[in-house]
Amino acid sequence: DKIIATPHYHPEFKYLKGEELNKVCEEFKKQLKENNIDIEIYLGNEIYFTYDLIEKISELDFYCLNKSKYILIEFPPTNFPLNLCNIVYELKQKGFIPVLAHVERYIKIHDDPEIIYDCIKTGAIIQINSSSLIGKQGKEIQRFCNLLIERNMVHLVATDAHGSQRRRPMMKDAYQYIEKKYSKEIADNLFINNAQCILDNKEIIIEEPFEKSMEKVSFLKRIFRR
């Protein structure tokens, strides 16, 4: 088994960063080996987007995914950037491939799913969470995940795990869900092949996304604002 550990990174918060984070990761890998736990750990960060990120990115001590050109980014849910495609473009110009984390969680994207289409055409990779896919975040979010998958707008499924109890991994259930609902080929691409491309720092070959007939799930506004 292989895991890319992606602890949060915010330039203004006191998370573990840089070499200090790398030392913790190396110690964790050592403990796994000493306890005969056959899991390979790779280091990355989930970078919290701030509006000066592009300007300061060369000064920040975050980790791309396994030292690749792929950079995992999440966005503020209540202050979602209006110019997301421009952000993707600017990151590409700086040599990164942005992986947009858990896009199914953003109300703005539910209101206008074609944002995802435009971002993919600009060069972004799209990730959703396993828990969302199998309905643990509600049927409407699950439905939206399926809409994206059916339109070739998802490239990765990840855990968003924060522990063994809170936000625990649900990858096996999610893989089986995709295999049964769609196909083994699609499941392998979303869970294995595309992730391996990131580990190997290779290009992810994506299917052409469908722009038309994207449904808007306005019901989510009521869910998130309760």
Predicted stretch roles:
Residues D1-H8, I41-G44:
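Short beta-strand segments at enzyme active-site cores
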Residues T6-H8, M153-P169:
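Short acidic/histidine-rich active-site segments
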Residues H10-F13, Y48-T50, R105-I109, L133-K136, ...:
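Active-site environment of divalent metal-dependent phosphoester hydrolases
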Residues K14-Q127, I205-R226:
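Extended substrate/RNA-proximal surfaces in nucleic-acid metabolism proteins
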Residues Y15-E19, N36-E40, R166-N193:
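Short acidic, glycine/proline-enriched helix-loop-strand junctions
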Residues H110-Y117, Q137-N146, E150-R151, S164-Q176, ...:
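Histidine/acidic-residue-rich catalytic or RNA/ligand-binding cores of hydrolases
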Residues I128, C145-T159:
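Conserved short secondary-structure transition element at the edge of the structured enzyme core
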Residues Q176-R226:
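Mid-to-C-terminal alpha-helical segments outside catalytic/metal-binding sites
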